[in-house]
Regions:
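Glycoside hydrolase catalytic-domain context in secreted enzymes
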Residues: 1-311
Length: 311
């Protein structure tokens, strides 16, 4: 239960030093995720891509079920079907030993030339909000932490690393945030990926108003925030103080730099405890610690899943 999970988290936090060799705040190859800690009984967090199907590493010989693209799912207007897709994807992710899905993409389609428009559902925030809830619930019911992305106002590929998106409060609330709010408030999403871009001059992954004031304090988000890969992080202390939990993929600003920030009293140890406990809570909540929801490899590309894909 929830109380038991929180007690287990406190036990593990009590035994973990800030300078622990197993960095829980950054990537750990070859797991494509974060390292575990055998001494404290913390398993690794292994991530996977499951947008249209499971990408199990870079091996083209690995077969998985290919489902419709999100933009096609959006055209179906069928949340129940997408919930079934979420269940099938979760089972295949677990069959490959993964426990976090880096997706789905909840950015609204804003430009016809957007290189990843296929990965989004629609230009309609309401439709996105309706589709995402059953998908998140299905994923997390079957042992996969769902990670909606890219938070937020990440709507083009060109200049995505350095663009500064100027957006007023009404547009933010009515267009860009509703899908994420639905995923968290109604779906119970336990992970959110922060984006490469800036919003009104502040980097998304060090945006305290978005990551703490809105995501956690307004919406009640209890999971952890993951940075987009390689170039979304730009700082150590500001990111930690904003509520950014895990840096991906290379550990450039966290790791030893985070240890140094604590030593220099730029970041308090209780902030570190909070960042770690939020990640552990998500892992407990979906059963990663208990290794629940194991599925055989035979479920991958099964007849049942192929039939769902054909619908």
């Amino acid at each position: 239960g929830l109380v038991g999970s929180e007690m287990c988290i406190r036990d593990r936090l009590g035994g973990m030093a800030v300078r622990d060799d197993n960095n829980p705040f950054g990537s750990s190859d070859p797991n494509f995720g974060t390292a575990g800690n055998a001494r404290l009984g913390i398993p690794p967090l292994i991530m996977g891509h499951g947008i249209t199907g499971v990408r199990a590493g870079r091996n083209p010989d690995v077969k998985a079920t290919y489902f419709a693209t999100p933009i096609a799912i959006g055209s179906s207007w069928d949340p129940i079907l997408y919930g079934r897709v979420g269940t099938a994807l979760a089972k295949e992710l677990r069959a490959f030993g993964q426990n976090l899905n880096l997706g789905p993409t909840l950015n609204v389609i804003r430009h016809p030339l957007g290189g990843r428009n296929w990965e989004s559902f629609s230009e309609d925030p309401y439709l996105i909000s309706q589709l995402i809830v059953p998908f998140v619930k299905a994923q997390q019911t079957h042992g996969i932490i769902s990670g909606p992305k890219h938070f937020v106002v990440n709507n083009q590929e060109k200049h995505r690393f350095d663009i500064n998106n100027i957006v007023d409060e009404r547009a933010l609330r009515e267009i860009y945030l509703p899908g994420f709010k639905a995923a968290v408030v109604s779906g119970g999403a336990l992970n959110v990926m922060c984006a490469y871009n800036r919003i009104n001059g502040t980097q998304a992954c060090e945006h305290k108003r978005l990551l703490t004031d809105i995501l956690r304090n307004e919406w009640g988000f209890r999971g952890f925030v993951l940075s987009d890969f390689a170039r979304a992080m730009h700082s150590t202390a500001p990111s930690a103080l904003a509520g950014m939990n895990v840096e991906m993929h290379a550990t450039k600003f966290y790791g030893k730099n985070l240890v140094n920030a604590v030593t220099q009293k730029l970041v308090a140890e209780n902030v570190i405890d909070q960042l770690l406990s939020q990640k552990l809570f998500a892992m407990f909540k979906v059963g990663v610690f208990d290794d629940f929801h194991n599925y055989p490899k035979s479920i991958v590309h099964s007849k049942e899943h192929q039939e769902i894909a054909l619908e």
